[in-house]
């Protein structure tokens, strides 16, 4: 819907004084999408490519391949011309690398880790294709002294738990003034303790399990690193939450 609305007023051609600026389809777009928001990211990329008049080859994460298969079935039933949408499942270092290196692919759009982004950029360089990247980040959530400390901290911590914390925009690094530190810790602790983890099909659960074992082990490892480096653990820990 957002893409259709944008197309209603989007100018593919502009007259600028004595010249014309025309935006044309770039060609074949290789798409590499993540496991944490699989359908969201695929639909965003696919809708944009169709709107621009591009064909595409999409590689979903090997951890969440079924969303790609479901989307392919939907697109097939919708009647999109054959060859416009192409789905290839597989591992990033194999299929992702093949897409990045292929001279038949004019552009790569990747949403994923910084490590994956670097690999894609390097593999794409020899063919001088365009590369669009949305990678991991850790921008600070800065709470100023004149903010509503309770609302700001509670909201910030709650956002960290969205999608079981598996979100690139999760504001997991919060900065507050020394004067508000103790209050912020108290609020954060309260929000964390009220956030229940368990079966995602249980309406009382606010968080389900981590997507895969490797990611779970990484989260546990990062918690332990924080403790080892002197951080104070105020909620949760390295043990598997009750109910999971």
Predicted region positions:
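Low-complexity, intrinsically disordered/propeptide-like segments
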Residues: 7-10, 210
